[in-house]
Amino acid sequence: MNDTVTIRTRKFMTNRLLQRKQMVIDVLHPGKATVPKTEIREKLAKMYKTTPDVIFVFGFRTHFGGGKTTGFGMIYDSLDYAKKNEPKHRLAKHGLYEKKKTSRKQRKERKNRMKKVRGTAKANVGAGKKKD
């Protein structure tokens, strides 16, 4: 890891309702490329004395001219709370969620079955039951 990279946190807030700490993260990296999120997570884990798996960082934007990147971070009290509150796409990036993917043919058949009915009956058709 680079020693020239500095991580600062602003607008720190403890969100007891969602069992997490949330903050704006400023990464100062003069003369260097944007710091990888994994490295930011590791440094935050060291700063807040926790493990990197409960830290979620996102929304990073590098300022014009480089040298400073700003993003958002959340540190959950436990992994269970993170799984409950984080969006599925962010969990998938961490490898904590696997989307069940139906085959293309099944999706198309379901779409065409749903075209044949109107209103609340679509829910029954969408569940996989055939209309008689």
Curated annotation (Swiss-Prot):
Quaternary structure (record): Component of the small ribosomal subunit. Part of the small subunit (SSU) processome, composed of more than 70 proteins and the RNA chaperone small nucleolar RNA (snoRNA) U3.
Coiled coil: none
Keyword Plastid: no
Presence of keyword Ribosomal protein: yes
Skewed-composition ranges (Basic and acidic residues): 90-100
Function according to Swiss-Prot or TrEMBL: Component of the small ribosomal subunit. The ribosome is a large ribonucleoprotein complex responsible for the synthesis of proteins in the cell. Required for processing of pre-rRNA and maturation of 40S ribosomal subunits. Part of the small subunit (SSU) processome, first precursor of the small eukaryotic ribosomal subunit.
Natural source organism: Xenopus laevis
Disulfide bond positions: none
Localisation: Cytoplasm; Nucleus, Nucleolus
InterPro entries: eRP_eS24_sf (IPR053709), Ribosomal_eS24 (IPR001976), Ribosomal_eS24_CS (IPR018098), Ribosomal_uL23/eL15/eS24_sf (IPR012678)
Biased composition, class Basic residues, residue ranges: 101-119
Keywords recorded for this protein, A-Z: Cytoplasm, Nucleus, Ribonucleoprotein, Ribosomal protein
Protein name: Small ribosomal subunit protein eS24
